[in-house]
Amino acid sequence: MRELTLQAQPYQGERHEKAWGHELWIINNNLYCGKLLVFKKGKQFSMHFHLLKDEAWYISKGEFTYKWIDTETATEHETHVKEGDCIHLMPGQPHQMLALTEGATIFEVSTQHFDYDSYRVKPGASQV
């Protein structure tokens, strides 16, 4: 019987600078994507949605105002989220995060990330 050996070597994540902070991409392949989103206090990314991406967030540090649009009623909502909270975003769900604390961090697990799969509804720090 042949023995299977896996050689998992440590590596550095891929850092992507943003006006609101930065993303640290841990992995992005055809099965899944894992990222850390680290925010500057008072900054937010755009209100946007994805048609392909299904994402789940874990607030690992700090506090945010989480904003989303109910697409059936066209109503915008917002709520306070903090360390330990989780959010699941289905494809097509417009969403936005505003950091209330410096270094506020989200651990994101999702289906594969594609740059062309972000549709902006309102600008964020990177668009102004």
Residue ranges and their predicted role:
Residues M1-K35, Q44-S46, E78-T79, V121-V128:
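A short, N-terminal "cap"/entry segment at the start of jelly-roll beta-barrel domains
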Residues L52-T71:
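Glycine- and acidic-residue-biased ligand/ion/polar-headgroup-sensing regions
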Residues F49-L51, Y58-I59, A99-E102:
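Short glycine/proline-enriched turns and hinge-like loops at secondary-structure junctions
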Residues D70-G92:
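Short acidic-glycine-tyrosine-enriched beta hairpin
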Residues Q9-Y11, H16-E17, T73, Q96-V128:
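Double-stranded beta-helix
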